[in-house]
Regions:
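Short hydrophobic/Thr-rich beta-strand motif most characteristic of the beta2 strand and flanking loop
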Residues: 23-31
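Conserved acidic segment of CheY-like receiver
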Residues: 1-10, 14-18
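Conserved phosphotransfer microenvironments
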Residues: 47-66, 79-86
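Short, flexible helix-to-coil linker/hinge segments that flank and couple to helix-turn-helix
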Residues: 87-88, 92, 96-146
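Two-component signal transduction core modules
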Residues: 48, 75, 98-100
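Conserved phosphotransfer cores of two-component systems
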Residues: 41-43, 67-72
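Conserved active-site segment of CheY-like receiver
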Residues: 6, 78-82, 103-104
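Acidic, metal-coordinating helix/loop segments flanking the phosphotransfer/catalytic sites
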Residues: 31-47
Length: 150
């Protein structure tokens, strides 16, 4: 796993959750896009946990191009808020992208990490409902989540 998030508390929490998982052999950090690319060169099959909103990407296209460059990597977008347009563009571009929101329950985040470790796509309940509804609001989490996809 490569944790690409600029919030120290989020990194610490993610490290803690991942350290409790059975199949987590490698935990790395990246503080910017250059470090992320360097880590992906060394570990091209890694799962990247990315807070897109806090990272130095110029847009969804740049993230998709990076995925094309490192085709064997999987991505779990882990952010506070993502626009529906961004989510559609990225999630429909490749099955390698999944999404969980920072306000999801611990159980839903753990499910997302378990799916990611098995190279399975995960889309949290709120985002899947948002995409299915055709709404154009941002993916700001709701207080209650019912069912997860994995």
């Amino acid at each position: 796993f490569i944790i690409a998030d600029n919030q120290d508390i989020t990194k610490a929490g993610m490290m803690f959750l991942l350290s409790k998982q059975k199949d987590t052999a490698l935990l790395l950090e990246a503080d910017n896009k250059a470090e992320l690319i360097q880590q992906l060169r060394l570990h091209p099959e890694a799962v990247v946990i990315l807070d897109y909103t806090l990272f130095d990407f110029t847009g969804a296209d740049e993230l998709i191009v990076l995925h094309e460059r490192f085709k064997t990597a999987d991505w779990l977008l882990f952010s506070d808020e993502l626009s529906v347009g961004f989510l559609r563009q990225v999630l429909f571009s490749s099955m390698a992208f999944g999404v969980a929101l920072k306000d999801n329950s611990k159980e839903e985040i753990l499910t997302a990490l378990q799916c990611a470790s098995r190279k399975e796509r995960f889309i949290c309940n709120h985002v899947s409902n948002l995409l299915l509804s055709g709404n154009n609001q941002s993916a700001a989490p709701r207080p209650h989540s019912a069912k997860t996809l994995c």
